[in-house]
């Protein structure tokens, strides 16, 4: 019986299938199912260092889901946890890095773009990659017809199965985004 790769345990990608997937493969292969996500969440008040330890000890090298037992609040990647984004947020909040929690640096679910489950069913992985790159978002939620979260797609999982990077460039989508970076000449996060 095939097993699921532990680093993308929630995705529908079997180890044998990973070598066969390409940009024309069904996007359903990279959707992380909400039922699996809910069983692997960490609390929003978890420190950044604790989250890194959880990733290391659980062989979960790419993405952690943040929330309560029944509600997904956000997503955080290992890349974010070790990037300068953490220091920028600490500086912006005027706190020490050690005082930040995953809630401070996660990508909140309410800011994630959403795709309908039936659209993802018709899409290929290449479509998802282009969507992420054009939106400048590393995570996309998948919702059903009632807007209930069905799953999440992570650029790290897309990159892993395609064996090529997904280029995510932060993009200002509102005047508030522009205004927030102007006083300190910071980057978008």
Residue ranges of predicted features:
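Tandem CBS (Cystathionine beta-synthase) repeat/Bateman regulatory domains
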Residues: 1-189
């Amino acid at each position: 019986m095939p097993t699921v790769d532990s680093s993308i345990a929630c995705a529908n990608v079997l180890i044998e299938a990973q070598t066969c997937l390409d940009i024309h493969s069904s996007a359903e292969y990279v959707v992380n199912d909400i039922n699996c996500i809910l069983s692997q969440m960490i609390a929003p008040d978890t420190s950044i260092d604790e989250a890194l330890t959880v990733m290391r000890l659980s062989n979960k090298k790419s993405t952690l889901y943040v929330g309560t037992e029944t509600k997904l609040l956000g997503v955080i990647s290992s890349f974010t946890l070790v990037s300068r984004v953490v220091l920028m947020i600490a500086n912006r909040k005027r706190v020490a890095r050690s005082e930040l929690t995953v809630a401070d640096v996660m990508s909140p679910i309410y800011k994630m773009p959403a795709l309908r489950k039936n659209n993802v069913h018709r899409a290929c992985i290449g479509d998802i990659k282009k969507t992420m790159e054009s939106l400048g978002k590393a995570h996309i939620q998948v919702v059903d017809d009632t807007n209930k979260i069905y799953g999440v797609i992570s650029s790290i999982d897309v990159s892993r199965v395609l064996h090529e990077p997904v280029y995510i460039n932060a993009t200002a989508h509102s005047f508030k985004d522009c205004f927030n970076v102007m006083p300190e000449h910071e980057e978008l996060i």
